[in-house]
Amino acid sequence: MRVNVRSNLAGKMRKKNFRKKFSRCQNRQTRFTKLKFMDLVIWRHAEAVDWQEDCDDLDRALTARGYKQAIRMAEWLDRQLPEGTRIFSSPARRCEDTVRRLDRKYKLHKNLLPDSSADELLASMQWPTSKGTFLLVGHQPMIGQIIAQSLGLKDSACAVRKASVWWLRSRERDGQRQTVLVTVQSADML
């Protein structure tokens, strides 16, 4: 009986290479958490009922379409966000209804109200020098102002679709602070 030494040796090499690759994958999460950058994930609330003269703007709820948008985006975010992400929401009902679909702990932040200042909010988050990942759920035009200011856009604000996410990363490269646009995701495209 002939034993194929070459195929037996090749099988051992494949197992050894698999173990190496597997251990690298396991260590990837550990290395990711040790990186020195700040992620700012900005999520605009999903579609809400229209404002009317006699209603309080902060009490507007999501529409049926808005709930579907929030669920789709929350499922995507849950797969992407690292453990330990600090989540903040505007106290407005439509923002809370949006962030609740994520099913993670969050805090209400008064600087995320519709008439708040983007500068005050960024200062309270210590953007861009803090470390870790922050998820903010808020309103236009403030989140558009945050994005434009962080990316150094000429306009003072940019348009942001309802239920969409903009993921920004602040990092230091060659002694210079940079803001990188990691991704923009729309609930309608999921």
Give, region by region, the residue ranges found by the protein language model:
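Active-site-proximal alpha-helix that buttresses catalytic centers in soluble enzyme cores
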Residues: 39-119, 143, 156-163
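Short, Lys/Arg-enriched N-terminal segments with co-localized hydrophobic residues
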Residues: 29-37
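Acidic, Ala/Val/Gly-enriched low-complexity intrinsically disordered segments
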Residues: 3-5, 10
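Compositionally biased, low-complexity segments
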Residues: 2-3, 19-21
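Short amphipathic alpha-helix with an adjacent loop that forms part of the alpha/beta core around
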Residues: 120-128
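Domain-level recognition of soluble alpha/beta enzyme cores
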Residues: 154-180, 189
